[in-house]
């Protein structure tokens, strides 16, 4: 059997660089090396692309995935924007499909997806549109509003306008949303830069912090409810996993809880009614289709005590770390971690073949 040459793309110029490394390590451990040739492609925190030797055998630490040195450096495109083909002497190293294990800006936001589209290489996950819209919480929520999905009230700000009149921004939040509220960078995941604000002093500090990570921020009303999540898998005919619940020991599920402490309980499947499950799964698919999703998403919801469902956000490239909800949801749905990764690769190839049917000449 001919092995699929799989390019694992990880790292990235993003605050979520370390999350990506953890995801890549977990994926490598799960991949069947009898079926796949694993070719590591590392993007440093400075944005330099590095291609390493084919992975054979076990990788035990993220440090082993961090490359350096001119020997490994590559340029994905030339300065003339002409895509660089593989040299004739290295045709055997050409990649069949790319698995981008990138989180945050410059990876999960459509930029790399656009590059891969230009290179005409199959890749796992969402395309340019869904990735870009899914990264920007303001754009995402605008799309959800247009699709008629129930969500929390929100408002947004850009740094340049806020700097000119901070008082006006704070007053707008207090009038439109009140306290408590959540302040978030618009284009970042993994709960980086998110703060819950109970008064003006906390609001001011939260704005300062969020604007360190993005030029645009979103402020949302506080919804009191259980945090539930569901996985979506597929292309044009997506399916949902069982619903899971996050029970954080802290006040909300922040970056440290997600990736460092593991300081949460995951209940899978969530102890909710069949009707609530159906509503959450229905809205997850509606959100997926509104974004024109492909491959996978994880949809996050709030479920209030009176049974009302609010969509919070969609993650277009959920993590695969040991603490990650997405693979756990599918394991409880009947799809093991290795099977899940293989299905994502299959979906990537399927979508690429479908795109080849498009006529580009008249």
UniProtKB/Swiss-Prot annotation:
Task: Report residues binding Mg(2+) 2.
Answer: 313, 315
Compartments (UniProt record): Cytoplasm
- What Enzyme Commission number does this protein have? 6.3.2.4
ATP-grasp domain location, by residue? 141-346
Cellular compartments per GO CC: cytosol
Q: Does the keyword Aminoacyl-tRNA synthetase apply?
A: no
Where along this sequence does the record place binding of Mg(2+) 1?
Answer: 300, 313
Which species expresses this protein natively? Bacillus cytotoxicus (strain DSM 22905 / CIP 110041 / 391-98 / NVH 391-98)
Q: Which gene encodes it?
A: ddl
What name goes with this protein?
D-alanine--D-alanine ligase
The taxonomic lineage of its organism, from the top, reads: Bacteria, Bacillati, Bacillota, Bacilli, Bacillales
User: Into which EC class is this enzyme placed?
Assistant: ligase
Q: Which GO terms describe its biological process?
A: cell wall organization; peptidoglycan biosynthetic process; regulation of cell shape
Query: Cross-referenced InterPro entries, in alphabetical order?
Result: ATP-grasp, ATP_grasp_subdomain_1, D-Ala_lig_Van_CS, D_ala_D_ala, Dala_Dala_lig_C, Dala_Dala_lig_N, PreATP-grasp_dom_sf
């Amino acid at each position: 059997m001919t092995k699929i040459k799989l390019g694992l793309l990880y790292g990235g110029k993003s605050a979520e660089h370390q999350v990506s490394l953890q995801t890549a390590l977990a994926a490598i451990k799960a991949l069947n090396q009898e079926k796949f040739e694993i070719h590591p492609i590392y993007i440093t925190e400075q944005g330099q692309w590095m291609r390493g030797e084919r992975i054979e055998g076990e990788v035990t630490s993220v440090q082993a995935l961090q490359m350096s040195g001119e020997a490994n450096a590559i340029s994905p495109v030339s300065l003339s924007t002409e895509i660089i083909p593989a040299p004739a002497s290295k045709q055997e190293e050409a990649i069949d499909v790319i698995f981008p294990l990138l989180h945050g800006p410059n990876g999960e936001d459509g930029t790399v997806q656009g590059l891969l589209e230009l290179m005409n290489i199959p890749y796992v996950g969402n395309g340019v549109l869904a990735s870009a819209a899914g990264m920007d919480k303001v754009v995402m929520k605008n799309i959800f509003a247009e699709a008629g999905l129930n969500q929390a009230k929100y408002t947004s700000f850009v740094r340049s306008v806020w700097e000119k009149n901070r008082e006006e921004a704070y007053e707008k939040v207090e009038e439109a949303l009140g306290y408590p509220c959540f302040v978030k960078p618009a284009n970042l995941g993994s709960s980086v830069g998110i703060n819950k604000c109970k008064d003006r002093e906390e609001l001011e500090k939260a704005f300062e912090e969020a604007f360190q990570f993005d030029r645009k921020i979103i402020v949302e009303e506080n919804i009191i409810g259980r945090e539930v999540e569901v996985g979506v898998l597929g292309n044009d005919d997506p399916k949902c996993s069982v619903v899971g619940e996050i029970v954080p020991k802290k006040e909300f599920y922040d970056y440290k809880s997600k990736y460092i402490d593991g300081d949460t309980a995951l209940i899978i499947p969530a102890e909710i009614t069949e009707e609530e499950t159906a509503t959450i799964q229905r809205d997850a698919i509606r959100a997926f289709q509104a974004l024109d999703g492909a491959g996978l998403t994880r949809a996050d919801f709030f479920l209030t005590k009176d049974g009302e469902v609010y969509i919070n956000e969609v993650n277009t490239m959920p993590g695969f770390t040991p603490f990650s909800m997405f693979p756990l949801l599918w394991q409880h749905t009947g799809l093991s971690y290795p099977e899940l990764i293989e299905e994502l690769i299959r979906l990537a190839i399927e979508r690429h073949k479908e795109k080849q049917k498009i006529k580009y000449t008249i």
